[in-house]
């Protein structure tokens, strides 16, 4: 049995633990601060996203532990190591602005997951690779759906 000792994979996964923690806070902010048309539909959708990405974060952290890593576990570590940025909502935003922000973060995660897929494929870490492929597929679908909500094509 091959042992996964890649520092690169461990660093990548830890970076995603940080990203996913910051992202779940952003989803919660959208959930709390959304107003206007489509409120009921999108408010419920944010509940679903919050759960999904919370589960992703847990799976990534547990995979990191399984390969001998140590996931970040403090707010300070999350903020210092995430490429997903905090986004304080200090003034009201339209539903479209909130969804554009959400799509931007989803696209960042999608692109980083693609890098992780390539890294883990090169290293022969099939378990992590499969996990990232599944997560990326879900993100691709969310991007398509939210862009459709915004009246845009998926690759626009």
Curated annotation (Swiss-Prot):
Keyword match Coiled coil: no
Main location group: cytoplasm
Keywords: Cytoplasm, Iron, Iron storage, Metal-binding, Oxidoreductase, Virulence
UniProt record, GO biological process: intracellular iron ion homeostasis
Reaction catalyzed: 2 Fe(2+) + H2O2 + 2 H(+) = 2 Fe(3+) + 2 H2O
Subunit structure comment from the entry: Homododecamer. The 12 subunits form a hollow sphere into which the mineral iron core of up to 500 Fe(3+) can be deposited.
Family stated for the protein in its record: Belongs to the Dps family.
PANTHER family for the chain: GENERAL STRESS PROTEIN 20U (PTHR42932:SF1)
Protein name: DNA protection during starvation protein
């Amino acid at each position: 049995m091959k042992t996964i000792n890649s520092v690169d994979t461990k660093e990548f996964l830890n970076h995603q633990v940080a990203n996913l923690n910051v992202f779940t806070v952003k989803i919660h902010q959208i959930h709390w601060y959304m107003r206007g048309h489509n409120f009921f539909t999108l408010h419920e959708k944010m509940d679903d996203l919050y759960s999904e990405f919370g589960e992703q974060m847990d799976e990534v952290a547990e995979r990191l532990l399984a390969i001998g890593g140590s996931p970040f576990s403090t707010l300070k570590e999350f903020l210092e190591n995430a490429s997903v940025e905090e986004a304080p909502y200090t003034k009201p935003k339209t539903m479209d602005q909130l969804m554009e922000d959400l799509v931007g973060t989803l696209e960042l995660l999608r692109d980083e997951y693609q890098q992780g897929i390539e890294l883990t494929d090169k290293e022969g870490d099939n378990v992590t690779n499969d996990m990232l492929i599944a997560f990326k597929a879900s993100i691709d679908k969310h991007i398509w759906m939210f862009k459709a909500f915004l009246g845009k094509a998926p690759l626009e």
